[in-house]
Structure formats: C-alpha cells, structure tokens
C-alpha cells in the first residue's frame, strides 16, 4: 500500500472516529474503503439508536457522514454502515420479497409493484432479479413515490 493511500485511510478513520465522538456515540468500527464507497461495521451498545425507526436514522447518518468526509477530503464516497446485523437481516428479507414478487408476477402473469423501498433496497432487488430468466424489474416514479415494478418477460 502506498504511503498516500495509508495516510488517506488513517485520516478517514480519524474523521469517522471524531464524527461519532461528536455525536456522543461510543463505538468501535472496522472500515473497508473502495474507490466509490466506504463500508463500516460498527460495534456499539447504541445500535437501536443508530438504526432508528425503519433504518431512517441509519440512512441519515450515512448521508451526513459521507457529506462530512467529502467536505474534508474533497471527494464524495457513499458510506454504508452495518450495525447490529441490520443490513444483513434486511437483505435476507429483501431476497424473500424479490422471490415472492417474482413468483406472483409469473403465476398471475401480471406486474407486481413493490412500494416504500429505499434506493439501496431497490438496487438489491434489481441485482437479484437481473439474473432471472422469467421476470424483469424496473423502477418507476420520482422521489418518495418511486416504486419497483416486477413483471414477467
């Protein structure tokens, strides 16, 4: 690893540590930094507070941390935080949702609309169904009205 890469990673870790300290959240974390994304796995007693209602607080923290890091480092990277296995469990639920939507679309020969999904959740379902020969998925609508549509091919 080059010296500048090492320095950047250390600096990123320091900014993240400072971010959580400023919020009075005691946590330790592991960080993976890729070209377009920073992934954090948090260990904390405050996981419920960090996740919030339906993950809304977690989504907000990810965005705010990404913006803070972009301001400090001059480049925007998406931040993904895993805490209390929330995302892992949510992904398992999304896999089941995708499977059920596919089954319904194929068996009833009609489109199935999945509402109230966050952008990252729609992305996961799109990736799951992209490999499927029987259905196609697409997002439709704008903003909070955006839905995911699963239809037979």
Regions found by a protein language model. Give the residues of each.
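RNA-contacting regions in translation and RNA-metabolism proteins
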Residues: 1-153
């Amino acid at each position: 690893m080059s010296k500048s890469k090492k320095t950047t990673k250390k600096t990123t870790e320091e900014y993240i540590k400072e971010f959580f300290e400023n919020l009075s959240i005691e946590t330790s974390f592991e960080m993976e930094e890729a070209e377009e994304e920073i992934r954090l796995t948090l260990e904390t007693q405050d996981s419920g507070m960090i996740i919030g209602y339906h993950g809304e607080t977690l989504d907000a923290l990810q965005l705010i941390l990404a913006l803070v890091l972009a301001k400090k480092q001059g480049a925007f990277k998406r931040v993904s935080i895993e805490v209390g296995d929330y995302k892992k469990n949510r992904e398992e639920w999304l896999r089941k949702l995708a499977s059920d939507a596919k089954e319904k679309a194929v068996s009833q020969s009609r489109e199935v609309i999945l509402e109230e999904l966050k952008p990252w959740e729609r992305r996961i379902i799109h990736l799951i169904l992209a490999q499927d020969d029987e259905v196609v998925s697409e997002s439709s609508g704008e903003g909070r009205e955006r839905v995911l549509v699963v239809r037979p091919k």
